[in-house]
Amino acid sequence: MNHMILEIFNNLNPYLITLVLLLITPKIVTLIFTKLSALTTPVFLLDFACYKPKQDSTQRALTRKMVVDKARKYGLTYSKETVDFMEKILERSGLGNETYFPEAAVVDEPTYPPTMQKAVEESQEVIFGVVEDLLAKTKVNAKDIGIVIVNCSLFNVVPSLSAMVVNKFKLRDDVKAYNVSGMGCSGGLRCIGLAKNLLEVHKNMLALVVSTENLTDNCYMGNNLSMIGTNCYFRVGGAAMLLTNRSSDLSQVKYQLIHSIDIQTASSDLSYSSINHQEDEDGFRGIAVNKDLIVSATEAI
């Protein structure tokens, strides 16, 4: 039988053999590439931590009533209509009755604008605090972290917030540090996607992702009702996550990250202009949200 097959093969036209090989080789290469692509490095969530101010923190919890009373008493630039509107939003916001505010907002007589130093202190207290909690929770050595990604949409300073993390925890010299800003509420999720992509390329590595916002530098003091939402919905807070692709962590991981899907709608003028960081007619800086946000968000989902 083998002899017959060999004889048939020897009698084939060499040009025909070449043609067949040319036809099937790309298909074989494509099949191999597809199989190899499917063998991406799995990425897992080792653990996470959410920030809560410690007893000695300068940050304080205020009730909704305290927030409104402060706005009436010390918000010299707020009109009665603005404070009444804030009170209605707070009642329907879904936030708990006690939420945390930075030192610049809880002092007896807040000053406007607050200093950059106070804003930096808020970010450092939140970021350093939540990272310390996460490292203690996971018993991870900071030197083992190979990737650091920090997200803060509205506060961008030099040195960057990610550089502050590297300096504070004395991370290693080859750590890959990224600072993400201006991405709004999707920034944290985009950072998770970035961490996943990096971990699929760099083997045996831990990625630290931190997401927060800064209130000290972004409290709106004007009377444009479309810009008052920041004061009502945003509070002091932050979250830190450790993602891993290390096989040694498999017995401790909580979840596997299967997919990270981003929908980019900035090419749409409607979406692009739905949220803006800008100054109002009186020069007060804040976040303006218009009615197109709901439409844009619905299309993205």
Where does each model-flagged region fall?
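Solvent-exposed alpha-helices and their adjacent loops that cap or buttress functional pockets
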Residues: 36-37, 141, 170-172, 184, ...
